[in-house]
């Protein structure tokens, strides 16, 4: 599988050199990175008295514009791999993040390829929201001279599987674009589909665009300034869990943990706004229960990625057990001829509801059957890492990384169930135990470059995590810009996450304003969006003063409710209608003044 960084075995740098290089460049802007690149090229190719001249090709080569619209990094990895394939075929390619793409130039594109994921309820990734809105607006141009292809990544456990890719594909065709290839919709196990699609794209584009001389093949755009690290999703760092502290009260309905992980001397670097990827082990007790329900022993040999493993080991480390999907329910029903599940087959809504409310182990318990080991793993999806917003800044914690974990716990007919990664960190990794981690960089959730810029942070629940990192960074830098936090949770006494730290920031003058919404401390429920409306006039003043707005947390409900409140505030105090307010907020998004990290 292709990773965000080249395989270290193919690089002229060893892991330590790569780590030092990353540490030296982690805070540089794309423009600064480009300058450094040119500087080293000049060092390598000194020409006394020569003036650098950009060679002009004999004829302009048709270029391929490749747009990466990524939420968790997978779409970016596919786009980067396709970029490399196109360069190897000597084709001109411009790879760009959707958030950096000047979408009004889309009418001039001849060859356009989009690799996109989907988030929430079928919404485009955060970095692609502006492009999506533009294409679906009255301003979208005709695209009769544009040929396009779309690769869509999704997760069949969600109702609106690959909806963003479906949207882009249908809209580009509706605007007159020529579809080069049928859209591909890939589930979480996307690698094989992506590899096949990439090969087809290269073949098609080679027939559409003349092959350039190697010196003419170029790759430009923000995505090319990637973060290089010897540790990746497929080659994670084996780190140490040093602190596991419950930060909700004993009477809280929530179990939230502050987790600290020691990165040692790995040199692994991150920035506020990045996420920590965590590979986890399924609960051995859950594996034992599932195996016994199917009348298996756990020692049956199965093949995983070409290796033979005992079934129990394969289930613990290689397969998703805590998230059910409509496809799994349908396939299990068909395979076992279950009388209770077969009536659901063909009814998408019922399948989705059943999968969302019934874990895999309970599906088997309620509809027992006998399967052999290979049939069982054939039903399951591969284990994927969980991403957690980083709650620390290395300017303060150095070789540590902190995350805020809401532990998923619930009962199914009296049987305790838990989330895979959250219970792994909270219950099964002892302090000083090993955990495999990597950094998922998120350049679409960054503090302002100007330290004097005001910042508005909206993060209920565990959405508070990146704002702890933001404040640590701003404090370490002595940033003079004002800071305003909106936080909410059920109860003040039980659920005020990092309360002492926020109070200290207020006392020190670093946190200029804090508005708190406790939804269960009074008869009428109060949420952060209510506080936004309550502070509308002051909020509008901050926006007019150039403030950047950040939202982190639940994508399904909170993010939409917060955006609705922001639109109402902009409309009321900006003296405009909702449509104009929506345009205003879209402009803030394009200017990177409205950024969201929602999940």
UniProtKB/Swiss-Prot annotation:
SUPFAM superfamilies: Ferredoxin reductase-like, C-terminal NADP-linked domain, Flavoproteins, Riboflavin synthase domain-like. Residues 234-448 form the FAD-binding FR-type domain. Keywords: Amino-acid biosynthesis, Cysteine biosynthesis, Electron transport, FAD, Flavoprotein, FMN, NADP, Oxidoreductase, Transport. Alpha(8)-beta(8). The alpha component is a flavoprotein, the beta component is a hemoprotein. It comes from Salmonella choleraesuis (strain SC-B67). Its cofactor is FAD; FMN. GO terms for cellular component: cytosol. Binds 1 FAD per subunit. Binds 1 FMN per subunit. It catalyses: hydrogen sulfide + 3 NADP(+) + 3 H2O = sulfite + 3 NADPH + 4 H(+). InterPro entries: CysJ, CysJ-like_FAD-binding, CysJ_Proteobact, FAD-bd_FR_type, Flavdoxin-like, Flavodoxin/NO_synth, Flavoprot_Pyr_Nucl_cyt_Rdtase, Flavoprotein-like_sf. Belongs to the NADPH-dependent sulphite reductase flavoprotein subunit CysJ family. This is Sulfite reductase [NADPH] flavoprotein alpha-component. The keyword NADP applies. Residues 64-202 form the Flavodoxin-like domain. FMN binds at residues 70-75, 117-120, 153-162. Its EC number is 1.8.1.2. Pathway: Sulfur metabolism; hydrogen sulfide biosynthesis; hydrogen sulfide from sulfite (NADPH route): step 1/1. It is an enzyme of class 1 (oxidoreductase). NADP(+) binds at residues 519-520, 525-529, 561. NCBIfam families: cysJ, PRK10953.1.
